[in-house]
Amino acid sequence: MKTSQKFNIDFDYNELHHDAPKAVQAPLIGLTGNFSDNKLSLLPGYYTSILKAGAVPVILPPTEDADILISFLNRIDGLLFTGGADINPLFFQEEPIRELQDINPYRDRQELLLARLAADRQIPILGICRGVQVLNAAFGGSLYQDIHSQMEGTRIKHSQQLDRSFASHTIEIEPGSLLEKIMGCSHVAVNSFHHQAVREAAPGFRVSARAKDGVIEAIESTEGKSILGVQWHPECFILNGDESMMPLFHWLTHEAKSFAKAKELHSRILTLDSHCDTPMFFHENIHFESRDPKIKVDL
């Protein structure tokens, strides 16, 4: 439906209602927002890229309420961790160094929990900038609080003054990686706005790209899960009409569609694997569709 310039809501409503049966059910992608100055915000590149990839973006406000987090995860088909402030180093067992910049306590705990809970549920995940650091910290990896003071050697410029929608340095993608498959090449020019970075990839992850100075630019799951994190800001490019980074968002949307289909299938079909050759007997009022400590159903 195109935006009407006639200010006729009845016409718009009737047109939308008429086309509703033809609409394709798009996957729902959850995005973490940036909470500061008593405002929840989301930069346009994120939702523009998700919409252009054919998915529906929905933002999650900051909360540590377990019921809200679980309800959110039960409804989405994919998850995108957005950029933002530094991560509190106490979450990866380090004391803050002098070069640490602003941290956001409203986001840290929520996003670290979300990462683990989403991975448990096989929800496809894309982490961007701070998001790749969230993924790494959530699963036991380490971070550089400041690459300029903690990494040896000469650094290239990782905090460009150039407009965010233009690339400022190149990265090398690991052969055979998921990222190489998505991008279709081994060298990519990216933008850069960070001073923290992944130090060592978490267990269950591999490094899939580095900058020329050795800074880790991407990690991905080695366990067959649809989890990928990148250090640059791919969402910015579309705002300049540059679609070179859209493969990342198409990948997330494709994986989210597959996950949505799997959820729908599993909601109708129950598979029971006892892992034993002897008969099993269950007491009355057992409900296999929910967790039960007596039978340890894994959902």
Which positions does each model-derived feature cover?
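N-terminal beta1-alpha1 cap of cysteine-dependent amidohydrolase-like domains
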Residues: M1-L126, A137, Y144, H148-I182, ...
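Conserved G/P- and acidic residue-centered "switch" motifs that form tight phosphate/ATP-binding loops
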Residues: C129
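Hydrophobic, aromatic-enriched interface-forming segments
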Residues: V132-V134
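Histidine-centered catalytic micro-motifs
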Residues: S192-A197, G229-P234, T271-P279
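Protein kinase-like catalytic core scaffold
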Residues: E217, S226-L228, L270
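N-terminal hydrophobic targeting/anchoring segments and the immediately downstream early-domain regions
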Residues: K261-L299
